[in-house]
């Protein structure tokens, strides 16, 4: 359709990704690297987690689901018991961070309040947090640790990871009039929107946070 109706000479193709593509644990292990799968379904069976539930008087499953990177708690059960949502979130995060394969666990209550240290890791977590849409506890797996099963498949990559191998992605502009070149400075995927706006001569979208990639404009 593009070839026939628009013409490639009038088309700009932009490619990127929403996460990286690291090697799977079996591949890394054969070269001597420490890497493993994590099984979130086992967390609630851990003795420490059982003790936490006993402390709160909870006899039913507390974790409703794990949709990376968020744990979703059974809010109806928490309310039924007359418990503080924030207190339960904080307690769950404190236990999860002790488990193998978990580098960080932060309650949504803490992320909402902003009462957290200003570190690169937590800044990355905050960039992926929305009080209205996010889960109850943000879980960051340790480097080279991946979820064992998601939607029926073992995976080596998923959303929400702040590590370099998962945040390093390509940004490719291809089209008539662009000069072939490679850019080695650090850029961000959010730079694509304002760059496209500059190319077509319009104002960038209201939610734009990126910067114009001047190399793309200079290459035309």
Which residues fall in each region the model found?
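Feature representing long, continuous alpha-helical segments
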Residues: 90, 94, 124, 132, ...
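Secreted, luminal/periplasmic, and some membrane-associated catalytic domains
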Residues: 1-148
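Short, solvent-exposed loop/turn elements at domain surfaces
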Residues: 146-150, 180-181
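C-terminal non-catalytic regions of proteins with extracellular/luminal or membrane-system context
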Residues: 3, 124-125, 173, 209, ...
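Short, well-structured beta-strand/strand-turn elements
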Residues: 103-104, 202-209
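Substrate-binding rim/cap in mid-to-C-terminal beta-strand-loop elements of soluble/periplasmic
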Residues: 38-86, 156-199, 214-220
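Short, surface-exposed loop/helix-turn segments at secondary-structure junctions
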Residues: 149-157
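Short, well-ordered loop/turn and helix-capping segments at boundaries between secondary-structure elements
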Residues: 22, 30, 98, 177, ...
């Amino acid at each position: 359709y593009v070839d026939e109706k628009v013409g490639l000479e009038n088309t700009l193709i932009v490619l990127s990704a929403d996460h990286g593509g690291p090697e799977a644990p079996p591949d890394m292990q054969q070269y001597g690297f420490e890497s493993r799968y994590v099984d979130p379904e086992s967390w609630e069976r851990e003795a420490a987690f059982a003790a936490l539930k006993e402390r709160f008087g909870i006899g039913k499953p507390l974790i409703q689901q794990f949709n990376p990177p968020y744990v979703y708690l059974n809010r109806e059960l928490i309310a039924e018991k007359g418990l503080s949502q924030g207190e339960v979130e904080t307690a769950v995060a404190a236990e999860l961070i002790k488990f193998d394969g978990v580098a960080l666990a932060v309650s949504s209550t803490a992320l909402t309040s902003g009462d957290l240290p200003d570190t690169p890791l937590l800044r990355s977590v905050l960039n992926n947090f929305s009080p209205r849409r996010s889960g109850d506890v943000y879980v960051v797996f340790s480097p080279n640790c991946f979820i064992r099963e998601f939607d029926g498949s073992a995976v080596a990559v998923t959303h929400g990871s702040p590590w370099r191998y998962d945040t390093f992605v390509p940004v490719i502009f291809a089209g008539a009039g662009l000069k072939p070149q490679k850019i080695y400075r650090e850029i961000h995927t959010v730079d694509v929107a304002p760059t496209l706006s500059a190319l077509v001569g319009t104002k960038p979208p209201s939610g734009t946070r990126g910067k114009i990639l001047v190399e793309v404009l200079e290459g035309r």
